[in-house]
Curated annotation (Swiss-Prot):
Location of the protein in the cell: Cytoplasm
Enzyme class: transferase
Family: Belongs to the RNA methyltransferase TrmD family.
Name of this protein: tRNA (guanine-N(1)-)-methyltransferase
Source species of the chain: Helicobacter pylori (strain J99 / ATCC 700824)
Length: 229
């Protein structure tokens, strides 16, 4: 699989892949990463990347011809995602689906965002990562890549790490407890559920499901209400 990131600030993207799990995955060629500087595709000799708004208003928007040129430079087939606050919220099910793609292109917004024609002509999907505003789409792109890459075979050392995660079946992941002895009196005041240590896997599974439901009801009532029981 390949990820291509189109951004005005490549230096914000590259350091994220210099350590930990995704660094090892790149070294093993489990996925490819390409980072393109949008300014390189500007028709302006000074690499100007933005324009004022028609009809007035504060801020600038990204040059649509620059976006078009950059997207044309990326080989097909590709699935193009624009990162913008106007997009639909990115969810776990999207990460699982997009992990099946061969090439995902992520276009990072900046300033007041995109000319609407860029979205209409270039985007297969538009995503945001929450109901809040960032200075650019780079963090969103990194979030998507991280979330998608985890579902590529071999990226996680233990495939079981993907099982029973938060948002599977719209429940949050069950509370977890370390299998260790601690010196901290405060930690020891809160014992792990006794059932976890008894070895009855059927009962442990049911308890984890019950705790998962309780946690979802407490933290994410919106998800909990999606279940009839």
């Amino acid at each position: 699989m390949k990820f291509s990131v189109l951004t005005l600030f490549p230096q914000l993207i590259l350091p994220y892949f210099e350590d930990s799990i995704l660094k090892r995955a790149l070294e093993k060629n489990l996925f490819e990463l390409e980072v393109l500087n949008l300014r390189d595709f500007s028709a302006n000799k000074y690499q100007k990347a933005d324009h004022t708004l028609i009809g007035g208003g504060a801020g600038q928007i990204l040059d649509p011809e620059m976006i078009e040129n950059a997207l044309h430079s990326v080989k097909n087939p590709k699935h193009t995602i624009f990162l913008s606050a106007v997009g639909k919220p990115f969810k776990q099910i999207d990460a699982m689906r997009l992990a099946q793609k061969k090439h995902v292109v992520l276009v990072c917004g900046r300033y007041e965002g995109f000319d609407e024609r860029s979205i209409e002509l270039g985007a297969d999907e538009v995503f945001c990562i929450g109901d809040f505003i960032l200075t650019g789409g780079e963090l969103g792109a990194l979030c998507l890549i991280d979330s998608i890459a985890r579902h590529i075979q071999g990226v996680l050392g233990n495939a079981q790490s993907l099982e029973n995660e938060s948002f599977e079946n719209n429940y949050l992941e069950t509370p977890n407890f370390a299998n260790a002895v601690f010196k901290s009196k405060e930690i020891n005041k809160i014992p792990a559920p006794l059932e976890y240590s008894k070895g009855n896997h059927a009962k442990i599974k049911q308890l984890k499901l019950d705790l998962s439901k309780l946690r979802t009801k407490f933290y994410r009532l919106d998800l909990f209400k999606q279940h009839k029981s």
